[in-house]
Amino acid sequence: MSLLALGINHNTASVALRERVAFGPDCIDRALRELVTQPGVSEAVIVSTCNRTELYCSLEKGQGEQVLHWLQRFHGLDAAEVVSAIYQHQDEEAVRHLMRVACGLDSLVLGEPQILGQIKQSYAHAQQSEAVKGSLERLFQKSFSVAKRVRTDTEIGASAVSVAFAAVSLGRRIFSDLSQTKVLLVGAGETIELVARHLREQNVTRMMVANRTLQRAQLLAEEFGAQVMTLEEIPDYLHEADIVISSTASPLPIIGKGMVERALKARRFKPMFLVDIAVPRDIEAEVDELSDAYLYTVDDLQGIIEQNLETRKRAAAEAEIIVLEERDEFMGWYRSQHSVDLIRDYRHQAQQVADEELQRALLSLQQGENAEQALKAMAHRLTNKLIHAPTQALRQAAAQGDHHQLSRLRQVLGLPQE
C-alpha cells in the first residue's frame, strides 16, 4: 500500500480552475463514496477550500493516475486543463505535505490557523462517509497533533500578518480583555468583515456597523449580531465605542477631531482606540492630538505586519524541522504496519504445518504406533518443513557467492556470525 496527496492550490492554479475543481458541501459525501470505490483505493479524505483542493488516499502502489482520472471525470475536466496545475506526493512526501498544510506552512498567509479547522472538517466528512480508517486515519490524527505542537513550540501564530488581524491585535494591547469592549466598525467591505471575524474570535459580542448603505451593513449585522447605523448617525453613537475600526472608500474623512473630542467628553475621557485602515483616511490625523484617543493608521499596521512576518518566517523554519521529525516518526510506524500482514501470514503458515503434523501423529498413536516413535517422527517432519524455505535461501545465496545475503540470513536465523 501507498499514501498519496494529489491536488491543486493557489500556487499552481488560477481562481477559475480552483472553482471548477472544488468540492462543495452538496457533493463531498458522494465524491468520497465514489473515490473509495476506485481500483486500488481503500481510504480517502478530500480537503477543499478557496485556496486548495487536495485528495489524500491510501491505495495500492501505482494507482495514482486512477485518482487523477477520477478527479477529471467527476468535474468534467479535460486532462489538458489540469495537468500543469496538479501536484502529486507519495508516501514520505505525502505525509510531509499534509503536515505542512495543517501547520499553515503552505498557506497563502504563512502560518494562518484557519486551514487546520478546515482540514478537521474534511476529516470529519470522511469519517461520516466511512471513507477513512487505518493508516489515513492515523496520519490525519498525527497531523493535528503536529499542528498543535507547532503552535505551542513556535511563534508562528503569535504575530499578526494581515491588516484585519493586526488591527485587532493592536486593540488587545490597549484593552487586555476585548470581550468587555464595544466596537464600532465603519464600512462593510471585506476587510471590515475579516475584522469582525477576528473580534468574534476574541469573544467580542457588542458591535456596531456604520455604512453609507444599510443593506450591506445589515448582512454583517445578521452574521455578527451587530447594531446597524448610517455614517450620518456616527456622532450619536461614537461615545459608546471603546474601539473604532474604519475602512471605507470615502474621499473625505468621516470622523473628525471635534466629533471624537465630544465623544470623549461623553465618555468622561475613558480611552478610545481608533484604527484607520482606509486610504485616503477616514479619520482626521488631528484626532491623534487628543490625549485619550489612540489613533493608528494603515502605515502603522504595515510596519507591524512586516516585523511580524519576519518573526513568522523564523518560526516557520523551526516548524519545518518539527514536521520532518514527526514525519519520520509516522513513517516508522507506517512501515512497521507493512510487516504485520507478513508476520501474521508467516505465523499462520507455521501453525498450519504444526496442526497437520499433530493430526498425523495423533492418527499414528490411534493406530497403535509407539508413542516415542510417533513423537520423534513428528518432530523430524516438523523440523524439515519449517527449515525448508530458509535452507533453500541459504543454498541459493551460497551458490551465487552472495556473502552479503548469507550474512543477513545468518542474522535473521539467529546463527553466530563467522
UniProtKB/Swiss-Prot annotation:
GO biological process: protoporphyrinogen IX biosynthetic process from glutamate
Active site residues according to the UniProt entry: C50 (nucleophile)
Catalytic activity annotation: (S)-4-amino-5-oxopentanoate + tRNA(Glu) + NADP(+) = L-glutamyl-tRNA(Glu) + NADPH + H(+)
Other comment: During catalysis, the active site Cys acts as a nucleophile attacking the alpha-carbonyl group of tRNA-bound glutamate with the formation of a thioester intermediate between enzyme and glutamate, and the concomitant release of tRNA(Glu). The thioester intermediate is finally reduced by direct hydride transfer from NADPH, to form the product GSA.
Family matches, as HAMAP family: Glu_tRNA_reductase
Chain residues that bind substrate: T49, C50, N51, R52, S107, E112, P113, Q114, Q118
Name of the protein this chain belongs to: Glutamyl-tRNA reductase
Family per similarity comment: Belongs to the glutamyl-tRNA reductase family.
Organism: Aeromonas salmonicida (strain A449)
Bridged cysteine pairs (disulfide): none
Record gene name: hemA
EC id: 1.2.1.70
UniProt cross-references to CDD domains, sorted A to Z: NAD_bind_Glutamyl_tRNA_reduct (cd05213)
Molecular function (Gene Ontology), one example: glutamyl-tRNA reductase activity
Record-linked NCBIfam families: hemA (TIGR01035)
PANTHER family listed in its UniProt record: GLUTAMYL-TRNA REDUCTASE (PTHR43013:SF1)
